[in-house]
A protein has these predicted regions:
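Bacterial Sec-dependent N-terminal signal peptides
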Residues: 2, 14-35
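Residue-level hotspots at or immediately adjacent to binding/recognition sites across diverse folds
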Residues: 27-317
Length: 317
């Protein structure tokens, strides 16, 4: 009788152990897919699992074997794609092992996004590339030779912004130039737009001299008052709000893209990229600067462990 009892207890303990191990493994696999990735100059790629503890030990500093500067990064279709100078395109399925892809050109690339089952990359001299998988790329005709800097997808439309340029496309292949009353002459720095996003049924584009444009459809654009003259580099819509970052530590928030409030970032360093995930905003910038915030209002500087220029950040969901 006691032998049967001991056997039952032993089997019960074994079963509990197996369930516990399976649960831990499942939690581990889940957390590994939700990661912040930041990119920067000299081929810098950084990782963080939570966006909160940004120390040199938590950051996993990687280099895929090149000194080329990286300008932007996105995540889609279970694939990371990062772009940079000299038409650099690299991709990874896990964020750890990266492969350089052949774009066939030598212009610098500035922005990348994923939408409508397509990766779209933009860059200097009107450069646009598309890919369905992040590996094989095709050059598209943009209809312009101006610099293209930022790209976003929303409401069935890609929107590209650049130097005195706004382009739209439904598929990433065929593009149409949209009219806007740019400052004269067109070469003025205030016509340089660098970031764009979509949210709350509105496209928002940000640029130098604190300029902000909004549009309901990507075609008709209206200028808004930002409240700053600092250059703005990037903008996102997350957690019900727009959030823009820029030079001298500038951070702006808005519920609708029209009314903007400047927030105290606690730094004067230029900020280039921003992302949101795990209920945390992460902004990156010059000299390895990383800031985090739970609400976009209160910001804390974190230790990246590096001094490289950071240009972009994304969160994999």
């Amino acid at each position: 009788m006691y032998k049967k009892l001991y056997l039952f207890i032993g089997l019960f303990i074994l079963l509990v152990s197996l369930i516990s191990c399976a649960k831990k493994e499942s939690e581990s696999n889940t957390s590994s897919t939700s990661i912040f990735k930041a990119v920067g100059y000299s081929g810098t790629i950084l990782s963080s699992p939570d966006g909160i503890t940004w120390t040199s030990s938590t950051w996993d500093s990687q280099n895929y074997g090149t000194s080329k500067n990286l300008s932007g990064i996105t995540y889609g279709n279970s694939t990371y794609v990062a772009v940079g100078w000299y038409s650099t395109i690299i991709s990874s399925s896990d964020g750890n092992t990266w492969t350089e892809r052949n774009s066939g050109k030598s212009w610098d690339l500035s922005g990348v996004t994923y939408g409508n089952s397509t990766f779209v990359v933009v860059g200097w001299k009107g450069t646009i590339f598309t890919s369905s998988d992040g590996s094989s790329w095709e050059k598209r005709t943009s209809g312009t030779t101006r610099y293209l800097n930022g790209i976003a997808y929303g409401n069935g439309t890609f929107v590209v912004i650049g130097h005195a340029t706004i382009l739209t496309s439904s598929d990433g292949y065929s593009w149409e130039n949209r009219n806007f009353e740019w400052n004269k002459p067109l070469s003025k720095p205030s016509n340089y737009f660098s970031g764009v996003t979509y949210g709350n049924n509105t496209y928002v584009a940000v640029g130098w001299s604190g300029r902000i444009l909004t549009s309901p459809d990507g075609i008709t654009w209206t200028e808004q008052v930002s409240g700053t003259s600092n250059n703005l580099e990037n903008v996102i819509f997350e957690n019900g709000s727009f959030l823009a970052v820029g030079y001298s530590g500038t951070i702006l928030t808005s519920p609708d893209g029209i009314s903007w409030t400047e927030r105290n970032s606690g730094t004067l360093k230029n900020l280039n990229g921003v992302a949101y995930g795990n209920s945390i905003y992460v902004a990156v910038g010059y000299t390895g600067t990383i800031l985090t915030s739970p609400d976009g209002v209160t910001w804390t500087e974190r230790d990246s462990g590096i001094s490289n220029y950071l240009s972009g950040v994304t969160f994999s969901r």
